[in-house]
């Protein structure tokens, strides 16, 4: 990805897809303008202080569930270690997320159910964590309400754009 970015003289990155596609875009963004190895950005390590700026990153999700379009973290497989690692930098986040329910209409029913359940779990996690801000609990409850009112509907009627948009 980095060589494609450099050779094309691109000035930004657009990541489209599910969580893995967007995580791939975030990983490329971390190293696109920097000489560091991707694994230098591992979450368990202290953030690198002297870096070139990260290219603007736009995320376009095609599923409802991971929330990857809102986060700076990315899960990437390290083939040498045979495991997934979390990479990130606090100054690298998507500048915008473009949400278009039309992009989820062709999602197979099983993926609609799986990613919708993933969104449900994220909402439960957010509500159950000790929150410093009561607004976070309100947002979690609103998310759970939207999922409860729309997940079964999009599973049964994949073309329902209102329900897809609510997911």
Give the location of each predicted region.
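Generic hydrophobic secondary-structure packing signal
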Residues: 21-23, 112, 119, 136-139, ...
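N-terminal small/polar loop signature for handling phosphorylated ligands or for N-terminal nucleophile
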Residues: 1-37, 153-164
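Short, surface-exposed, charge-dense and proline/glycine-enriched linear segments
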Residues: 12-24, 44-51, 75, 89-91, ...
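A glycine/threonine-rich phosphate-anchoring loop and its flanking beta-alpha core
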Residues: 33-134
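Active-site segments that bind and position negatively charged phosphate/pyrophosphate groups
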Residues: 126-167
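Short alpha-helical scaffold segments that flank and stabilize functional sites
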Residues: 3-4, 27-28, 32, 122, ...
């Amino acid at each position: 990805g980095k060589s494609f970015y450099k050779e094309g003289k691109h000035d930004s990155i657009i990541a489209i897809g599910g969580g893995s596609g967007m995580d791939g875009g975030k990983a490329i963004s971390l190293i696109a303008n920097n000489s560091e190895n991707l694994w230098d950005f591992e979450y368990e390590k202290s953030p690198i202080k002297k870096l070139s700026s990260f290219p603007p990153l736009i995320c376009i999700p095609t599923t409802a569930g991971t929330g990857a379009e809102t986060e700076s973290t990315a899960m990437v497989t390290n083939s040498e270690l045979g495991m997934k690692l979390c990479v990130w930098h606090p100054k690298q986040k998507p500048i915008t997320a473009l949400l278009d329910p039309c992009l989820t209409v062709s999602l197979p029913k099983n993926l609609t159910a799986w990613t919708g359940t993933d969104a449900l779990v994220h909402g439960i996690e957010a509500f159950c964590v000790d929150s410093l801000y009561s607004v976070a609990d309100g947002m979690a409850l609103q998310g759970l309400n939207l999922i409860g009112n729309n997940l079964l509907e999009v599973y049964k009627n994949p073309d329902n754009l209102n329900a897809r948009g609510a997911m």
